[in-house]
């Protein structure tokens, strides 16, 4: 199922019982977070608050609050089908020429999908039905949520920030939280390695002192939203990837005040600039770690224009101790990562990012071990191959007889196959998430790899234990008589 815009997606969700309309008056200040948090933890539906207190614009929360809805947003019916999305990305990251005619025929579906990569530029679009500028720009009229009691101010959370480096051929889409500080100003919290920050740095070097154009889209179609959080290859734009997911080209329209192209179907678009000389102290905010973060200076985004539909929907979320929406997204996108990793490391059997690990801070990898030291190679590969894992603090590597998604299995492997002095790998002075206050220096800390694999000659001088295995004939015989034993039935 493909969706032309957010409303198309919401219609389907409502038909399937995956969307709940809240007609009571609910306050964007704290109350929406409490309701959304309870709903997400119970595996509940997306929420459309139709009567936000003090505002006349509905608020959409919990849109991707279950892995199933993430899969639906990517045009798939099952979470397991996201592996196919990962295979497509692996193909695009390192395409290989067909090995023969039969191989060419099998590649045709992938090449057909590539035809949907270019964007379709429109002359006018629904996202520009209403245009506000100059004194009419007032961000306080948007129902921007304040999520936690100690948050310093309301926070824009689901904005797709659109930038373009002056030396780059394509635009970048990224999602960065934005603190409301004035009727026309937001603090743009982007980390230095993210696409928007890199574009900004490039602009400052080539256009010193000049304002940097920025547009922010809220409420785009699900393929475009998810394209901004997926590990898209550097050579592929998020719009192009959204076209692949949707099966049709992404429709865009030029911003009214700059040359950046924004999703034509967006609900609301903020346009403006960042003055290279203007920064402000951001935070504190409760974030995906479950703690309030430190304050830090970031660039200020000055909004000069707001464009929107005549009856827009404001798309929002909250972040907090897992599970939250980012954790659910991470759980679903886990399936996308696996084929990409397997393309580079075919020995990987499974890869799992437990949601409790704040989406990316801990990874469990199972491999078909082939030689001594293999586990350490995989650890280093996980940390270096995709930038999504540059902040992963812990990597646990197990054999393929271990279920990476079962903590009981993983802990059994760690406690029986791992010697701390021999099998722990510590790497110091590596990039760490700025929100990780456990690191000794902001943005710089250590990583740990745990080799929980069976040890090969050269890794140990001792005879290695042989795992206990049941006799299959006995298992079959007991299966046949099991019901008649009535072990779990109460005696009369």
Swiss-Prot record:
Its main location: membrane. Belongs to the UbiD family. One of its GO terms (cellular component) is plasma membrane. It catalyses: a 4-hydroxy-3-(all-trans-polyprenyl)benzoate + H(+) = a 2-(all-trans-polyprenyl)phenol + CO2. It is found in: Cell membrane. Gene3D superfamilies: Single helix bin, UbiD C-terminal domain-like. It is a peripheral membrane protein. Keywords: Cell membrane, Decarboxylase, Flavoprotein, FMN, Lyase, Manganese, Membrane, Metal-binding, Ubiquinone biosynthesis. The keyword Iron-sulfur does not apply. HAMAP family: UbiD. Homohexamer. The active site is at 287 (proton donor). Its cofactor is prenylated FMN; Mn(2+). This is 3-octaprenyl-4-hydroxybenzoate carboxy-lyase. It is an enzyme of class 4 (lyase). It comes from the Bacteria. Pathway: Cofactor biosynthesis; ubiquinone biosynthesis. Mn(2+) binds at residues 172, 238. GO terms for molecular function: 3-octaprenyl-4-hydroxybenzoate carboxy-lyase activity; metal ion binding. It comes from Pasteurella multocida (strain Pm70). Its EC number is 4.1.1.98. GO terms for biological process: ubiquinone biosynthetic process. Catalyzes the decarboxylation of 3-octaprenyl-4-hydroxy benzoate to 2-octaprenylphenol, an intermediate step in ubiquinone biosynthesis. Binds 1 prenylated FMN per subunit.
């Amino acid at each position: 199922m493909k969706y032309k815009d957010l409303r198309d997606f919401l219609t389907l969700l409502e038909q399937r019982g995956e969307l709940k309309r809240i007609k009571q008056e609910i306050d964007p200040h704290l109350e929406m977070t409490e309701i959304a948090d309870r709903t997400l933890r119970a595996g509940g539906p997306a929420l459309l608050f139709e009567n936000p207190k003090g505002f006349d614009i509905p608020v959409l929360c919990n849109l991707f609050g279950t892995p199933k809805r993430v899969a639906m947003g990517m045009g798939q019916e099952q979470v397991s089908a996201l592996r196919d999305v990962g295979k497509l990305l692996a193909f695009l990251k390192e395409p290989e020429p067909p090995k023969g005619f039969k191989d060419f025929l099998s590649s045709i579906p992938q090449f057909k999908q590539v035809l949907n990569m270019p964007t379709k530029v429109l002359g006018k679009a629904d996202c520009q039905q209403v245009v506000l500028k100059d004194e009419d720009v007032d961000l306080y009229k948007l129902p921007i949520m304040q999520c936690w009691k100690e948050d310093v101010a309301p926070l824009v959370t689901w904005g797709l920030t659109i930038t373009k480096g002056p030396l780059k051929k394509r635009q970048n889409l990224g999602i960065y939280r934005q603190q409301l500080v004035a009727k026309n100003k937001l603090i743009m919290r982007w980390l230095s390695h993210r696409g928007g920050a890199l574009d900004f740095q490039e602009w400052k070097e080539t256009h010193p002192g000049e304002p940097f154009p920025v547009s922010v889209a809220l409420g785009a179609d699900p393929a475009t939203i998810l394209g901004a959080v997926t590990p898209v290859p550097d050579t592929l734009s998020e719009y192009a990837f959204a076209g692949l997911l949707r099966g049709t080209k992404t429709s865009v329209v030029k911003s009214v005040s700059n040359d950046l192209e924004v999703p034509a179907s967006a609900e609301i678009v903020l346009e403006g600039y960042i003055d290279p000389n203007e920064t402000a102290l951001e935070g504190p905010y409760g974030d995906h770690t479950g703690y309030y973060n430190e304050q830090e200076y970031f660039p200020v985004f000055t909004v000069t224009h707001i464009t929107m539909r005549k009856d827009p929907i404001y798309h929002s979320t909250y972040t907090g101790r897992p599970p939250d929406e980012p954790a659910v997204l991470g759980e679903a996108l886990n399936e996308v990562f696996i084929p990409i990793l397997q393309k580079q490391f075919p020995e990987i059997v499974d890869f799992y990012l437990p949601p409790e690990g704040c989406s990316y801070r801990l990874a469990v990898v199972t491999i078909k071990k082939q030689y001594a030291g293999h586990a350490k190679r995989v650890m280093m590969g996980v940390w270096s191959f995709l930038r999504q894992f540059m902040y992963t603090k812990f990597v646990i590597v197990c054999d393929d007889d271990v279920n990476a998604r079962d903590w009981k299995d993983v802990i059994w492997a760690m406690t029986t196959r791992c010697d701390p002095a021999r099998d722990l790998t510590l790497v110091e002075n590596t990039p760490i998430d700025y929100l990780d206050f456990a690191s000794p220096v902001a943005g710089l800390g250590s990583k740990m790899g745990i080799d929980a694999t069976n040890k090969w000659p050269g890794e140990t001088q001792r005879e290695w234990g042989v795992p206990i295995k049941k006799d299959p004939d006995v298992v079959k015989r007991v299966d046949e008589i099991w019901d008649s034993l009535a072990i779990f039935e109460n005696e009369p």
